[in-house]
Structure formats: structure tokens, C-alpha cells
A protein has these predicted regions:
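Extracellular beta-rich repeat passengers
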Residues: 358, 378-398, 403-540
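Short glycine/acidic-rich loop motifs that flank beta-strands on beta-rich extracellular proteins
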Residues: 93, 104-107, 127-128, 148, ...
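Short, surface-exposed basic-aromatic patches at helix termini and helix-loop junctions that form
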Residues: 108-117, 272, 360, 388-389
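Right-handed parallel beta-helix
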Residues: 120-121, 158-166, 252-262, 275-287, ...
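Outer-membrane beta-barrel domain signature
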Residues: 233-235, 294-295, 327-330, 385, ...
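Active-site-proximal loop/turn and secondary-structure-junction residues that shape catalytic pockets
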Residues: 102, 273, 283, 322-324, ...
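Extracellular "leader-to-stem" segments immediately downstream of a signal peptide or signal-anchor
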Residues: 2-12, 16-97, 102-250, 255-257, ...
Length: 540
């Protein structure tokens, strides 16, 4: 059987088809599809990282039409699509083809050795009938909980891919709550008139009474409903249990390439505890106002390539996570060995983000040549007391940003749970009379290197908001230009900050560097050993 090896991984010649005859008289050729990352990149990384392995698939394919699927936008094609996947899996692997057309479906479960391929003009629309998505035990926002099954899912699978040029629409508008202040008056009136309910404050619309009840029971509890709940209770709150659009858990050798994923009920792409992941030339399109509408949340994964993608998000764009609080520390799976290159992020709460769920640790992350446009924050590191976890060895370079309403770069260890644009003052440190001791619940951020960053338009250039008991440490910034900034660089509770060739142009005249409770700050070779609570203001 012919094997299709998808080595998809920037900078090498276009697709080449190379017959490999290896002494087997009856073996057909093996197809090697375009490399997309120069192998030399691995050897030039500032940390040691093994190459990301790619999935391989036998040269066998089926078309969902042959299983009874109909592209009329009316017929529910759940069984046909899953039957096709199951047959290809049973045959040892291959390709399931979704041709052009509008395909209505319920949840799709991807199995080992299956490449789900969408042709151009194929639109897969997930049903707005939420009863089709069973309530299952899973993980969301770093905690074990119950949610509805994702429209696309895989668990413990190996050699899986979603490729081609089609679109997967999660029908998220039927799931998500919507905040009034994110819509125009006309949009809000239209939404309320469509059905659903509005909370007691008149600020948030929910798709049903059950969704509102779920929100009330989950208040201040990380979206997890409290109390002794029966199956009937969970079912009533089904609309609150919004799934991520794509959930891959404990999978190995995963490829997402070429397809568009849009309108997710919650997060869009969520690989969890996976290894050898490639996400290349993917488009994510979520409304800018979509609640929890993250584009990509890479959680507790090892060896990943995130390259050549376009992410339009309602929340964080490219986000690195590793579990929350005690559960995340107990899981103990860091997110590590990740290359993020040549991506564009629009809207949302952050371009590249680490946290806030980082309790299992984050290390060995390389981010290069990315563009952020109109994101609330550009480079965003966030956590708070209780998380624990160690974030280190992050290397960021060649970042271009425009129209950043808040910080171009922020380290915030007082994260309050909202986007900076929703409440810029929520995370400001309050006066503390007692400094807590360092424990396993204390998050640590250190050894981070950022260079060659250009930003035009920012609310504030840089903000370090560290913890007094565990200062942000060894942060290195070089060749940073931020123009048209309302405020400059503000450093608080940091140690060993090295800044070289920093240029900050403020909209109004004034000092562009403010420091308080920092030590060992070096600016172009000049060291500031200790600056206390009285603070100091300078110009670069």
C-alpha cells in the first residue's frame, strides 16, 4: 500500500513528489509532501529540541457521499461522516474526503491514522441543536469538569490530520453569552429580540435560562458550576457547558493545515497533553466580541510547530497553558518545546500569551516573525497567586504590532480574569501590608528574552506587575521601538531587568520610564542596583 508521508513542516522548495523505491518490487512509491520548516531552524534554536514528527497516512481514501452524506444544509450528516472515519481507521488509515458543499453535522470524532480532508468550497456547519453534543467529563480552562462534547474531537489518537481548504463553522453564536457593552445599541436590541434571557443587571445576554443558571452557579469558580448536581441539573445547564470547537486530548503526531475554523462556542483550537503537533496555514475567525473566543490554546503539549497561520480572536490569540492551580501542578505536564513563527493575530485580548493557567510550567518557547494588529495587548504574560508553576526560557523576536489599545508587553502577576480592554485597572496592585510566603502556589517567571519588537500605537509600552515575594526575574529586552504610546515603560517588583536600545515615543511629553521596587535594572550598560517604594522616573 502506498504511504503518504506528510512532512509538512518553512523555507524549502515547493511540493515535490519523490518516488522512493527501496528494494520492494511490489511496493508503490512513497509521496513526500513539501517541507515547511528548514531543518536548520532546530539547530539554531536557543534550546535543544527534537524535530516535530509528522503523521503518515496510507494511500487510501473514501468520500463521505458514498456513506450517504448530502450537501443540502438540511440533512444531518453526523453518521455518514463518522462512518467514513471509522471505515478508514478500520482499513489501517487514509483520507476521508469532504467535497464542496454545505454539510450539516453533529460532533465528529477523529480516529487514529485518519486525514480528514476538506475540498475547496466545503463548508461543515455544526448543528445548533445542542442536544446532539453529549455532556462528558473533560478539561476546560485548566480544570477537570463537565462540558458538552466538542464538535471536533480526538482522544488517545495517533497520526491524525485535518487538511484541505474547507471551513468548519462551530455555530458558536447559539452557545455564547454576549456582553451588552461589546455591541452597538441596534445589535443588542436585535440579539435580545431573538430570544434567550438577560441577566439581572441587564448587561449580559444568555441563550437560555439554563445557560444563565450555569453562569450563576459558576460565579467566582472558573466557569465550573458549584454544588451537588444531578444529571438533570447538568442537562438543564447544557447551554452553559460550551465546548471548544476542536478538542484533541493525549494525541500524537497531529497536523492541522489549510482549513478554516470559525465561530467557536468557546475556545477554538485546544490541543491538550498532545505531542508532535503541527498547525500550519490555518485560519481561525471568531467575532472580536466572542466570549472566551480564544483562537489557539496549546495546553501541556510537547514539541509543536505553530506556523504561517492567521488568527482573528475574541479572546487570546496564541496562548500557551499548562493547567490551573492544584490540578495543574498535580498533572505536572509543562507546555514545552514550541516554535511559533510567521503568524498574524487580529483583535482579541493578546497576540502571544502565556497563562494564566500555567501551573504545570512553560519552557522552551521560540516566537519569531509575528504580527499583531489591534489586539488588546501584544505580548502578554499573566498569572496570579495560587497558580504556582515555573515559566522560563521564552525567546521572542521580530514582532511587529499596530494599534494596541493597552500594553505592547505586559507581565502581570495580579491577573483578575478579564481582558485588559474590559477593565484596564482590574489588575493594578493594591497596597499590601503583609507579603505572603513563597509556596508551591507562587508563580515564577524568569529567563525571558525579547528583542527586535516594533509597535506603532499603544496605551502603554511595557508594564511589569510582579509579586513582592517572587519578583519577575532576568527579563531581557533589546531593540524595542514603541511609538505613539500614551504611557512608557512601568516596572514594578522585578529583578535583573536588562534593557538595551529601547526607544519609546510618547504622544505627550514626559518621562517614559518609571520604576518602583526593582533591583539590578541595567539600561544600556548603566546599572540601577535598587529602587524602592519611592520610585524613580527617567527617560531612555
Amino acid at each position: 500500500m502506498t504511504t503518504l508521508i506528510i512532512k509538512k513542516i518553512l523555507l524549502l522548495p515547493a511540493t515535490c513528489l519523490i518516488p522512493l523505491l527501496t528494494g520492494c518490487n511490489n511496493c508503490p512509491s512513497t509521496t513526500i509532501v513539501e517541507d515547511i520548516i528548514d531543518p536548520a531552524i532546530y539547530t539554531s534554536l536557543p534550546f535543544k529540541m527534537d524535530k516535530v514528527e509528522q503523521p503518515t497516512f496510507p494511500d487510501y481514501s473514501v468520500n463521505i457521499i458514498d456513506f450517504g452524506a448530502k450537501p443540502d444544509g438540511i440533512t444531518l450528516n453526523t453518521k455518514a461522516i463518522n462512518d467514513a472515519i471509522q471505515q478508514v481507521n478500520a482499513k489501517g488509515g487514509g483520507k476521508v474526503i469532504i467535497p464542496e458543499g454545505l454539510w450539516l453535522t453533529g460532533p465528529i470524532e477523529l480516529l487514529s491514522n485518519v486525514n480528514l480532508y476538506t475540498e475547496k468550497n466545503a463548508l461543515v456547519l455544526f448543528s445548533a441543536d445542542h442536544s446532539l453534543y453529549p455532556i462528558i467529563n473533560t478539561s476546560f480552562e485548566g480544570l477537570e469538569t463537565r462540558r458538552c462534547q466538542s464538535p471536533i474531537s480526538a482522544r488517545n489518537a495517533e497520526n491524525i490530520a485535518i487538511t484541505g481548504h474547507g471551513v468548519f463553522d462551530g455555530n458558536g453564536d447559539t452557545w455564547r453569552p454576549t456582553k451588552k457593552d461589546k455591541l452597538t445599541e441596534g445589535q443588542w436590541k436585535k440579539l435580545v429580540a431573538s430570544g434567550g434571557v438577560v441577566d439581572a443587571d441587564g448587561r449580559i445576554w444568555y441563550p437560555s435560562e439554563g445557560a444563565l443558571k450555569g453562569a450563576i452557579l459558576s460565579k467566582d469558580n472558573f466557569n465550573v458550576p458549584r454544588g451537588e448536581l444531578t444529571d438533570s441539573d447538568w442537562d438543564y445547564m447544557r447551554d452553559w457547558l460550551r465546548p471548544v470547537l476542536l478538542s484533541f486530548i493525549k494525541c500524537n503526531k497531529v497536523l492541522l493545515e489549510g482549513a478554516t475554523f470559525k465561530n467557536s462556542p468557546s475556545w477554538c483550537l485546544h490541543p491538550l497533553s498532545c505531542e508532535n503537533i503541527t498547525i500550519n496555514k490555518v485560519t481561525v475567525s471568531n467575532p472580536w466580541y466572542s466570549q472566551n473566543g480564544d483562537a489557539l490554546d496549546l495546553e501541556s503539549c510537547n514539541k509543536a510547530l505553530i506556523i504561517n497561520n492567521s488568527f482573528d480572536a475574541g479572546d487570546d490569540g496564541i496562548c500557551i497553558k499548562s493547567g490551573k492551580d492544584e490540578q495543574g501542578r498535580k498533572r505536572g505536564e509543562p507546555c514545552q518545546n514550541v516554535i511559533v513563527m510567521n503568524n498574524t493575530v487580529l483583535h482579541g485580548h493578546g497576540g502571544f500569551v502565556v497563562g494564566s493557567e500555567m501551573s504545570g510550567g512553560v519552557n522552551n518557547i521560540y516566537v519569531d516573525n509575528c504580527t499583531f494588529m489591534g489586539t488588546d495587548v501584544g505580548l502578554r504574560f499573566k498569572s496570579n497567586r495560587g497558580r504556582g508553576g515555573l515559566v522560563e526560557n521564552i525567546y521572542i523576536s521580530n514582532i511587529n504590532m499596530i494599534n494596541i489599545p493597552n500594553e505592547a508587553l505586559i507581565f502581570n502577576l495580579y491577573y483578575g480574569g478579564k481582558g485588559r480592554g474590559e477593565d484596564p485597572n482590574q489588575d493594578e496592585k493594591k497596597a499590601e501590608t503583609t507579603i505572603p510566603p513563597v509556596t508551591e502556589e507562587t508563580p515564577i517567571f524568569r529567563n525571558i528574552f525579547i528583542k527586535d519588537v516594533t509597535c506603532n500605537g499603544a496605551g502603554r509600552a511595557v508594564f511589569f506587575n510582579g509579586l513582592p515575594e517572587m519578583r519577575i526575574k532576568n527579563i531581557n529586552m533589546e531593540n524595542i521601538i514603541v511609538s505613539n504610546a500614551k504611557e512608557g515603560v512601568v516596572l514594578s517588583e522585578a529583578d535583573e531587568v536588562n534593557m538595551k536600545n529601547i526607544k519609546i515615543e510618547l504622544v505627550k511629553s514626559g518621562k517614559n520610564l518609571k520604576m518602583q521596587n526593582v533591583s539590578n535594572v541595567t539600561i544600556d550598560g548603566k546599572n540601577h542596583a535598587e529602587i524602592g517604594a519611592q520610585g524613580e522616573e527617567l527617560n531612555f
